[in-house]
Amino acid sequence: MEEVAVKKRGRPSKASVGGKSSTAAVAAISPGIKKRGRPAKNKGSSGGGGQRGRPPKASKIQNDEDPEDEGEEDGDGDGSGAELANNSSPSPTKGRGRPKSSGGAGSGSGDSVKTPGSAKKRKAGRPKKHQPSDSENEDDQDEDDDGNSSIEERRPVGRPSAGSVNLNISRTGRGLGRPKKRAVESNGDGEPQVPKKRGRPPQNKSGSGGSTGYVPTGRPRGRPKANAAPVEKHEDNDDDQDDENSGEEEHSSPEKTVVAPKKRGRPSLAAGKVSKEETTKPRSRPAKNIDDDADDADSADQGQHNSKKESNDEDRAVDGTPTKGDGLKWNSDGENDANDGYVSDNYNDSESVAA
């Protein structure tokens, strides 16, 4: 008994098995009506349940064609619906498929009558908002309340003005921009567009059609940087372009002369000697190397002083007169000059005494 009530989907098979005596009974009762599809679930068992989902399409047509069949099936409608809902009906009288709108007792008929009407009133999905009608009513009320209806008629349809500045948002969604002004000028006079130029004017140009625009070369433009290494790299890479553009070589030559490796900081002492010695000597003993350099420098300085003394001595010997005597003469002269008064006084005194 329970095996007969198992849910079966799709079209029923034509070959009736022993458990499918319900279809034969339905065919015997109403041979003209052929029912297919799933049986009704909530029909008859729950009074206010009704049919869920899409409402029946051909319900009214079937009601008009077979009013007598409805009366015959009303008697067995409740029991069959309840048994189908409980899955314990051995021979349901209604059969499978979508039930009729008028099938079942008064409650079933009421549900069937309500479903098409409710489907029309209530549509599936989200209900629509009634904003247009409300806005129209509000506009009518505003016009009735405000005496200045002519002012509102002058306003364009769309978003109201911001209050201070009319940005023309209602039509375009954007404010008055630059293109509109250009359009007015072009409509009035075609000439103002040519001389009116925006942006930075071209520099070192004889005119708009005089010389060509910027020709991209690898050489940097403007004042060269302090670091000359990247500039030299650019110059090395652009030797081919310099050969092609002979006129630009004159401009590049002053850049080469101007840009020189700029040395900053304190120059290194005896850099050449240190570099030569570093190539020959290991760098494990820097202190001794520095001392040796200092000693060498001191010895060189002493040698220079000695050579100067020797040259001075040779000059004195060549003159024939001893330099020491010259120095003494010069010093003696100075001393005599300083002591002239004292010596002369003594001499005069002696002469005066002798006389």
Swiss-Prot record:
Pfam families: AT_hook (PF02178). One of its GO terms (molecular function) is minor groove of adenine-thymine-rich DNA binding. The modification Phosphoserine is found at residues 30, 80, 88-89, 107, 109, 112, 118, 133, 135, 149-150, 161, 164, 170, 186, 208, 246, 252-253, 299, 307, 311, 332. The modification N-acetylmethionine is found at M1. Residues 64-77, 135-147, 237-247 have a biased composition (Acidic residues). Keywords: Acetylation, Chromosome, DNA-binding, Nucleus, Phosphoprotein, Repeat. Residues 119-130 have a biased composition (Basic residues). Residues 345-355 have a biased composition (Polar residues). Residues 1-355 are annotated as: Disordered. Residues 307-318 have a biased composition (Basic and acidic residues). The keyword Zinc does not apply. This satellite DNA-associated protein is a double-stranded DNA binding protein specific for tracts of pure at DNA. It may play a role in organizing the higher-order structure of euchromatin as well as heterochromatin. This is Chromosomal protein D1. It comes from Drosophila melanogaster. The gene is D1.
